[in-house]
Amino acid sequence: MEDFVRQCFNPIIVELAEKAMKEYGEDPKIETNKFAAICTHLEVCFMYSDFHFIDERGESIIVESGDPNALLKHRFEIIEGRDRTMAWTVVNSICNTTGVEKPKFLPDLYDYKENRFVEIGVTRREVHIYYLEKANKIKSEKTHIHIFSFTGEEMATKADYTLDEESRARIKTRLFTIRQEMASRGLWDSFRQSERGEETIEERFEITGTMRRLADQSLPPNFSSLENFRAYVDGFEPNGCIEGKLSQMSKEVNARIEPFLKTTPRPLRLPDGPPCFQRSKFLLMDALKLSIEDPSHEGEGIPLYDAIKCMKTFFGWKEPNIVKPHEKGINPNYLLAWKQVLAELQDIENEEKIPKTKNMKKTSQLKWALGENMAPEKVDFEDCKDVSDLKQYDSDEPEPRSLASWIQSEFNKACELTDSSWIELDEIGEDVAPIEHIASMRRNYFTAEVSHCRATEYIMKGVYINTALLNASCAAMDDFQLIPMISKCRTKEGRRKTNLYGFIIKGRSHLRNDTDVVNFVSMEFSLTDPRLEPHKWEKYCVLEIGDMLLRTAIGQVSRPMFLYVRTNGTSKIKMKWGMEMRRCLLQSLQQIESMIEAESSVKEKDMTKEFFENKSETWPIGESPEGVEEGSIGKVCRTLLAKSVFNSLYASPQLEGFSAESRKLLLIVQALRDNLEPGTFDLGGLYEAIEECLINDPWVLLNASWFNSFLTHALK
């Protein structure tokens, strides 16, 4: 039957049916008759609304393949097939705009011509019996009921069949075809009977032979036979005392359930050690941009041309010198690498025609920085499997690091507004259905709150760098290509702006597997003096490369300009995710949307406008040592976005583990706050699982410290 459903119905319908069943915890592979029934019902709903439109005069018309430009509105709004929250949002929206009474149950369609909700029924029994069942359940005069059967009969409220003969005949023909197809495969009897709750063939299904032996072998301990086990499962009451249940399941398990009280949880233990260091792939709050406004130079949009143009806006270059060496590196090589970039950019300018890409000369400093010829030689396993002391490298345990204040500052900066807009509003066509109107409205409000956010700049910067690096890694595998780090934005006045943050030089990149590493050297401009927080810059060699004149309230001041240089690496899979950083916008929008939905369901109307425009209302943003912080809805949008962006920038196994394990403790604490009297066993084990992820990652350590603030306030 499952195969039949997948062959017989449109894949979109099959997917919707699977979703609906999963929402109710049902398995399409097991409850195959139900699966078929849901698909049939969905298809009838879609066929009911197909080709039916309302023209400019408000008349109902049928258009099968007409002028796509005609101003037509769909006659029916389809409610069936949406997830519950969305379906109720559509229903509420229709009720608010039309004044129709709100139904108690989710109907299938709304008819804009007759201004009424429609309940569609498809039955394998007598139509009048099914009609009465529906009417009894709905108990509403306002909802129109229309029942179809597989035998070509139909029944509708007050014999008003809504649609023309031909449209209804199409539905009946399709139902008859489905029935014949089922019958030819021997599926119809089981399908027909399953609606009436008669005993079906499946229930008398006997397990014999090999299957029976396998079933007997795979019984849990202490069960003598399959019947014995079935009886036990049928009689198992899921509620009640957990200890009893566990001992009932197995003699080996003995869990003492401890009550979880306000005094039970302790704060997470953060590691001691030297302060943690910056490990993002590019500078965040410390980045400095060289920019051109309204770019219109020849070759505008070609990264190398743009970069040279940006470099020319700065006149304060000076002889570079090292101000903060890298502890382990050969620092003069970093200095030589920067000088080489300047020299090769100068060479390009002296050429007649500027090339579109630039491959650096393979100098000794670049070979060193990019780890050329440093990888151990790979030997075929066949050649060395007889070596007696073959073993894996001993790798050092990571050194524990303590939380440093810089990561909180980074996060605060990411939530702030910049004076430029980093995303454009997509051009999306006119809204047709009410749900699209709500969606566009939410998207526009959200975009307005986050388009100028620094986290959005990080998204666009990340997308650009990862795309450029992945492209170069595939297109110029053996070359040390010079890749400018560029972003584009618009100023307050709406002028276009191109920004250069620095350069990347990529190493050899024969990336066969997703996890194969490409090395790169990054060189990024900054005004931050590294000597203020040297621990943050452990992995960097920092040069002083110029002096920049800055306009301040007291006039022009000269500040030293630094170049942060480091060796780094990434992989195909990391670049793929980096290219998709725009997803962070979607994730935070969905979080905001669920807040709006919660408000709307309380008020029983769409609260989008009030939500964004009520400037006096504040919302909880997070917990700090001082207590729960609150802010405007815009601040909430930007904070959620920044969290999502940092999860991407600082993605790591430590973060995965911490998020998964700390969530369990969070749920227990929330249950305590809701007075649900939670109980736990092996709380120590849970703490261990959380704390083994707290090693040295700055973002994870910051999240752990936030978690501790949350614990303190939650348990007051």
Curated annotation (Swiss-Prot):
Give residues annotated as binding Mn(2+) 2: 80, 108
Q: Which residues bind Mn(2+) 1?
A: 41, 108, 119-120
Q: Kindly state which keywords UniProt assigns to this record, in alphabetical order.
A: Cap snatching, Endonuclease, Eukaryotic host gene expression shutoff by virus, Eukaryotic host transcription shutoff by virus, Host cytoplasm, Host gene expression shutoff by virus, Host nucleus, Host-virus interaction, Hydrolase, Inhibition of host RNA polymerase II by virus, Manganese, Metal-binding, Nuclease, Phosphoprotein
Main localization, broad class: host cell
GO BP field: cap snatching; DNA-templated transcription; symbiont-mediated suppression of host gene expression; symbiont-mediated suppression of host mRNA transcription via inhibition of RNA polymerase II activity; viral RNA genome replication; viral translational frameshifting
Query: At which positions is motif Nuclear localization signal 2 (NLS2)?
Result: 184-247
Paste the cofactor note.
Binds 2 manganese ions per subunit.
Example of a GO MF term: metal ion binding
Pfam families, per this entry? Flu_PA
EC main group: hydrolase
A single cellular component GO annotation: host cell nucleus
Query: What does the record give as EC number?
Result: 3.1.-.-
Q: How is it modified after translation?
A: Phosphorylated on serines and threonines by host kinases, including human casein kinase II.
Instruction: Give cofactor(s), names only.
Output: Mn(2+)
Check the record and name the InterPro entries matching this protein: INFV_PA, PA/PA-X, PA/PA-X_sf
Q: What domain of life does the native source organism fall in? A: Viruses
Segments spanning the bilayer are: none
What is the annotated localization of this protein?
Host cytoplasm; Host nucleus
- Motif (Nuclear localization signal 1 (NLS1)) positions are 124-139
Q: What does this protein do?
A: Plays an essential role in viral RNA transcription and replication by forming the heterotrimeric polymerase complex together with PB1 and PB2 subunits. The complex transcribes viral mRNAs by using a unique mechanism called cap-snatching. It consists in the hijacking and cleavage of host capped pre-mRNAs. These short capped RNAs are then used as primers for viral mRNAs. The PB2 subunit is responsible for the binding of the 5' cap of cellular pre-mRNAs which are subsequently cleaved after 10-13 nucleotides by the PA subunit that carries the endonuclease activity.
Entry's HAMAP family?
Answer: INFV_PA
Instruction: Fill in the subunit field for this protein.
Output: Influenza RNA polymerase is composed of three subunits: PB1, PB2 and PA. Interacts (via C-terminus) with PB1 (via N-terminus).
* Family named by the database record: Belongs to the influenza viruses PA family.
Name of the protein: Polymerase acidic protein
Q: Which organism is it from?
A: Influenza A virus (strain A/Chicken/Victoria/1/1985 H7N7)
Q: What is the lineage of its organism?
A: Viruses, Riboviria, Orthornavirae, Negarnaviricota, Polyploviricotina
